[in-house]
From Swiss-Prot:
EC number: 3.1.-.-
Major location (coarse): cytoplasm
UniProt function note: Could be a nuclease involved in processing of the 5'-end of pre-16S rRNA.
Record lineage: Bacteria, Bacillati, Bacillota, Bacilli, Lactobacillales
Native organism: Lactobacillus delbrueckii subsp. bulgaricus (strain ATCC 11842 / DSM 20081 / BCRC 10696 / JCM 1002 / NBRC 13953 / NCIMB 11778 / NCTC 12712 / WDCM 00102 / Lb 14)
Record protein name field: Putative pre-16S rRNA nuclease
Keywords: Cytoplasm, Hydrolase, Nuclease, Ribosome biogenesis
Length: 142
């Protein structure tokens, strides 16, 4: 089962894809979106679904540290509903607490990306990788 992992933000969507066996996640791209103009990146996502023959989506669910729903949960849920309607594929959710923080740390400490502008271009993709990889790991444990 091949899945697309999405880190849905207010201006961009970070995208990752699993390998065909559902073991590892790799970054793919960052899709610009414009909520005010109702541009949710569906055209780009459609191409990716076809290209990777995706069977579903994993979206990050931005919870607060105490486990309650964060402000952006509604954004992720709305995107999940759009994806289900558009593609007819299942949408799964994974707790994304601290994925952006972890992504920033990885990019600075392990990849040596100290330039904030440079990191900004890939941090959403890295967060999508972490969301998807966490989901894949949990599925293998079950």
């Amino acid at each position: 089962m091949r899945l697309l992992g999405l880190d849905v933000g207010s201006k961009t969507i970070g995208v990752a894809v699993s390998d065909p066996l559902g073991i590892t996640a790799q970054s793919v791209m960052t899709i610009p979106i414009d909520e005010d103009r109702h541009n949710f990146g569906m055209r780009s996502l459609k191409k990716l679904v076809r290209e990777y023959e995706a069977n579903g989506f994993v979206l990050g669910l931005p919870k607060n540290m105490d486990g309650t729903a964060g402000r952006s949960v509604s954004r992720s849920k709305a995107m999940g509903e759009r994806l289900e309607q558009k593609f007819g594929l299942p949408v799964y959710y994974d707790d994304e607490r601290l994925t952006t923080v972890a992504s920033e740390r990885i990019l600075v400490e392990e990849a040596g990306m100290h330039d904030r502008r440079q990191r900004k271009e890939v941090v959403d993709q890295m967060a999508a990788v972490l969301i998807l990889q966490n989901y894949l790991d949990l599925q293998r444990k079950e």
